[in-house]
Amino acid sequence: MSALIEKHPFKPFLPPGCKVVLCGTFPPKPEKWSMDFFYPNFYNDMWRIFGMIFLGDKEIFFDRDKKRIDKEAIQKLLNSEKIGIGETVTEAIRTRDNASDKYLEVVKMVNLPELLSKIPDCNHFVTTGEKAAKVIASLTSTLVPEVGSKTECEIKMENGIIKKFYHWRMPSTSRAYPMKLEKKAEFYRHMFEEIGII
């Protein structure tokens, strides 16, 4: 029996005037979702970090009783701050029945020129984990940045123009990543400050 190739379930969310796009690898299986949007697992810390940084409340997007995440409120914030969300992997095989990047076999990577052509004001690409960072480093023939740092990259666009952008590597927002929520939030806050979002 051949391995099942899965397509990424979400299309990139790219607000008009998007200045930065955050990209991970692959979401968990649908039975683990608390909404149908990026970082859908109730126990992933991405939207807690956003709540802390932008609204001063890490639980503002979470309904603990219903185990739901407020997608509409998140998208409203992303639109307001001109922050995009996408992926580095568009097709993958789960070699084990979980969401760990360790057991994710990349089949197809994001088409960077195509993605960046949709967001001409964006000069910052943020990866939210080691595997995502390695994908972008591979696509741009650059070194993988250290956590919290950035690398300058160049990519040849579909029209032949060379576009420069910065690849930032942030800590994974998975609970399995050994770093306290507050420390993760410090990395993300610094990155948003450097970019000029906050």
Regions found by a protein language model. Name each.
Residues 22-25:
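N-terminal nucleotide-binding beta1-loop-alpha1 segment
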